[in-house]
């Protein structure tokens, strides 16, 4: 596969350029480089040479996928986890020894729920040297402002933190709120939440989402934001056509040595050098 640092085509107007001379090409590359620096675009793109790629799993899995449409995640160099109280007491030193290099930790839900393991998980992840941040599970029966204030109240600013995360997905099993607002309302509330988080922490949050939620609400929107996508059987380029992404949650049934039970495992979209560059630009 070939990895390319790129900015969405909209950054330079979507025009197709053609040049006949090396001089013109050199001038264009210089201009384009300057435009990329100005725009601040940090998306990653990819190319797969085959439509179905298998491969040996990097980690164990209690329900493994043996053939991935569009490309497998296992050969990616940078893997991470996301956790909540449901994983119980975690041994973060063991997680680090498994080669895990980033973590997203559940902090809050709605406007009044705090994950009881958040403080310990975020402390222990950071102590183990794993770049990490907190995520908020959005609740559609509470205003975005109230939810952002609740998150800010419970998640301190932490030097060296990854950007915080806004988890956007439908919750059909919720005992208290199964509301599904119109897509325009969803996006409006998301923007309110994200702006409040940006003002407080200095970074716009990463957007985590699922296939159905993205299709119904986010397709074609938030083009300059960082996306973390769930896709457990196919590559995101198949499941989320046209969406640039940075993180991919590829299993909810991963297994790590010396860590009890199933755990969500994710990959970063690019190479190790791209990871280093992304960290430098993203960490505050």
Language-model features and meaning:
Residues 163-241:
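Catalytic domains of cell-wall/extracellular-matrix polysaccharide-remodeling enzymes
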Residues 38-40:
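C-terminal motif of bacterial Sec signal peptides marking the signal peptidase cleavage site
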Residues 5-6, 20, 24:
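Intrinsic-disorder-associated, low-complexity terminal segments enriched in Asp/Asn/His/Tyr and depleted
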Residues 73, 77-89, 106-191, 198-200:
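Substrate-binding cleft of extracellular glycoside hydrolase catalytic domains
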Residues 45-80, 222-284:
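Functionally critical loop-and-helix segments that line ligand-binding/catalytic clefts
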Residues 24-33:
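Sec-dependent N-terminal signal peptides
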């Amino acid at each position: 596969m070939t990895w390319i640092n790129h900015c969405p085509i909209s950054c330079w107007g979507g025009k197709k350029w053609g040049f006949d001379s090396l001089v013109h090409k050199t001038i264009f590359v210089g201009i384009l480089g300057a435009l990329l620096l100005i725009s601040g675009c940090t998306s990653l793109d990819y190319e797969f040479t085959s439509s179905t790629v298998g491969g040996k799993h990097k980690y164990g899995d209690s329900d493994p996928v043996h053939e991935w449409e569009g490309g497998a995640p296992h050969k990616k160099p940078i893997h991470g986890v996301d956790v909540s109280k449901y994983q119980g007491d975690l041994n973060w030193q063991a997680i680090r020894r498994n080669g895990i290099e980033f973590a997203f930790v559940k902090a809050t839900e709605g406007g009044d729920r705090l994950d009881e393991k958040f403080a310990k998980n975020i402390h222990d992840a950071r102590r183990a040297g794993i770049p990490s941040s907190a995520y908020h599970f959005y609740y559609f029966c509470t205003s975005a402002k109230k939810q952002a204030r609740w998150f800010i109240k419970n998640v301190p600013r932490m030097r060296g933190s990854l950007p915080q995360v806004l988890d956007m997905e439908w919750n059909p099993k919720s005992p208290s709120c199964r509301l599904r607002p119109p897509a325009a309302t969803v996006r409006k509330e998301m923007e309110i939440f994200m702006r409040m988080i940006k003002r407080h922490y200095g970074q716009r949050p990463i957007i985590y989402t699922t296939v159905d939620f993205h299709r119904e609400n986010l397709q074609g929107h938030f083009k300059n934001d960082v996306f973390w996508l769930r896709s457990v059987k196919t590559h995101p380029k198949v499941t989320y056509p046209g969406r640039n992404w940075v993180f991919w949650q590829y299993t909810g049934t991963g297994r790590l040595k010396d860590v009890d039970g199933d755990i969500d495992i994710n990959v970063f979209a690019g190479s190790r050098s791209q990871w280093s560059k992304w960290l430098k630009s993203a960490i505050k």
